[in-house]
Design a protein with these regions (language model features):
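Glycine-rich beta-alpha loop segments
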Residues: 1-39
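Conserved phosphate- and dinucleotide-binding cores of soluble alpha/beta proteins
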Residues: 42-135, 141, 147-148
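Active-site-proximal flexible loops/turns
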Residues: 23, 47, 151
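Residue-level recognition of conserved structural "scaffold" positions that shape functional pockets
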Residues: 23-27, 91, 136
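Glycine-rich phosphate/pyrophosphate-binding loop and the adjoining helix
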Residues: 140-158
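A generic alpha-helix structural signal
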Residues: 3, 93, 149-153
Length: 158
């Protein structure tokens, strides 16, 4: 649904190129006639990029891959994921907080999944003064894919 919704706005879908939610987004974009990009990582247990990727780039190092995600993204939609997903998201949040990159819309799909993380951000780092309200105020947590896509596209022509 996410990839197809982005394709309908003529916006490329860029994922890690793997299975699961990444594959679903790439497939949706590809089948809807949009651009489907996969930035995969060389890991001992990872397969080749999923078959729905139109442009595949493979990276040896996570930091290079994260730089490419940050550099070539005007917004991000995060689906539930593991440590790799968290690493990519916190990298982008850190770059925006420290003004090493411009702020871009970050949207988190899945209130049940991401809600606890946002509760923790407010109760620990924010309440202890390690982050500021503006560091998290613009972040959206939603279950609505159309709302997620609209928010991620805010500020760009789509």
């Amino acid at each position: 649904a996410v990839g197809a919704a982005l394709a309908a706005r003529d916006v490329a879908t860029m994922t890690g190129g793997g299975p699961g939610a990444m594959e679903a987004a790439n497939r949706g974009a590809h089948e809807a006639g949009g651009m489907s990009v996969g930035l995969s990582i060389e890991l001992p247990f990872e397969e080749e990029p999923n078959p729905w990727v139109d442009i595949a780039l493979r990276f040896r190092y996570f930091f290079v891959r994260k730089a490419m995600f940050s550099w070539y993204s005007n917004g991000a939609i995060a689906m539930p994921g593991g440590f790799g997903t968290l690493d990519e998201l916190y990298e982008q949040l850190t770059l925006m907080q420290t003004r090493k990159t411009e702020k871009v819309p970050l949207v988190f799909v899945g209130k049940d999944y991401w809600g606890g993380m946002f509760d923790w951000m407010r109760s620990a780092p924010l309440s202890y003064g390690y982050i500021s309200p503006e560091d998290i105020d613009g972040l959206l947590v939603t279950d609505d894919v159309e709302k997620a896509v609209a928010a991620a596209c805010a500020g760009i022509e789509c």
